[in-house]
Amino acid sequence: MRFLVACLVIALSVYFAFHGLEYDNGFIRFTKRSPANRTGVKAPQKSPFEEDDLMTWYMEDSDRQSYSLHYDYYQDSCPTAERIITKGIREIYDAKPSVAPSLIRLLFHDCFIEGCDASVLLDADESLTSEKEAPPNLSLKGFDVIESIKSELETVCPGVVSCADVLVLAAREAVLMAGGPFYPLETGRKDSVVAFKEIAERELPKPQASISVILASFATRGFNERETVSLFGAHSIGITHCTFFEDRLYNFSGTGKPDPELDTGFQQELKTKCPFSASAPSPGTGIGSSIPASDYGGVSSAGRGNDGAIDLSYNNEGGEENFGTRYYRRLMQKKGLMYADQQLTGREETEMWVRAYASDTQLFRRDFAMSMMKLSNYHVLTGPLGNLCDAAKLYLGLAITSHRRLKCVNAKSGLSSTSLSNKKAFLWF
């Protein structure tokens, strides 16, 4: 009997070691405790720069804004959707690494203008002016990639997966392929039936923008300084052209001299690749104030001065594990190409994050992932919001939806299939 009692005591002791006791109105309630970390992996310590719990904030913000977005949205309606997208991007990336910066830039140009609604994919017709026609978007690429993947999805699950979801998931895979962090995404976005060409012309960031303009532009979309600086880390891949920074080499702010904030050694290196051109633009004038063209931009380079290409990864400096951090380290060395990039070191509230990301790879990857999640959820259309669901206009709504889907599937940029060359596309500036 004593043996049985002893066994019972031991059993209860073990049970209570993994469970707690709570008293609720006189009743004893057993509560399970969280199991100990048995992986042997030491939990990362908080960086001194991490003053707020960004993950908790994001999840709360996501709950308020995502509405009907949720994980595995297509689990029942198209269970292979995300696998098809992942497989497609990986195959294309293996053949053409330029797909990574192309898709990240395409995502930004879509989401930054009225939200992640695939409006940038819409072609023009008699009733619609396409965002593709806005000067900042003329050099966008990756439309054929989205079209190819969407077409495959249509053969498996016709009329189910939105173009907006295809784009955000494709961009996430592109980030991962380029050496960036993975980040979870909810799905269930709907597509827009309208485009916003004028807004794109007016509000997409310019390469010569001041830090005040940049921060204000991002702030109106809910991004603080930390998030804004982290998103700029994507400028560590892709290319840009001489015409969009040559004023910093030869005629900064109309002085006839180089930008004093540009490292002199780097300045001489750039001059060998971008020789002086009398047509070099000044900030805020001419086409130079628009978004830089990519390697196969839709804007003719005639009359634009130099059009040499500069690899923003500097031959993948430091390897893929330095995705992002090499960008911040170069800013600390005064080697930022774009005026807008180097401006991040001009204010204490942004410079502190440049320093932090230059020295802490894990902090950057975490913040970049969180900011990309937030960007991908910006002003999404969900449920009926992507359709005209008024009963009196139901037929019209269905017609427009069908028309939109066709446009999305056959989205063309006006560029040939060579638009995805082995060169890399510039990102959103």
What are these regions (language model features)?
Residues 1-429:
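Catalytic cores of secreted/periplasmic or lumenal enzymes
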